[in-house]
């Protein structure tokens, strides 16, 4: 699809734009067992007062993004000045990169006594280790001013509040 976007832009002048998202974290959608879903499930278990069993190794970095940033990035790209866009097939966008151990530490600051243990799934481990530690979003930053608004700390605070309200 990305090369087709380039072709239609160069051949017919079609204004095509797209993004490559990292793992998306949302308080709206329940975790469904995907490789990045541990980063959503941890908040649900923390709010419930449960010990969280993480199936990703503690040292694996993965790029993540909070849903509000993902939505804003999409709108910002669609509203960007086409004259400033050099790329047409797809833009990498990034927000934060962390390990399960890093997110555990942040959650524990907000939920004292939170506990997490590891039971690494070999298939998910292999998948997660095959991904890049971080995405290079230089083109998005330079061509249309992409900049995330949420970091791990602010996302954690918001996720815990919204998940708690949802579970009431």
Regions found by a protein language model. Name each.
Residues 1-17, 46-48:
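Active-site Tyr-X1-5-Lys
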Residues 55-57, 63-168:
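C-terminal substrate-binding subdomain of Rossmann-fold SDR/epimerase-dehydratase oxidoreductases
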Residues 15, 51, 147:
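Residue-level detector of anion-binding/catalytic polar loops
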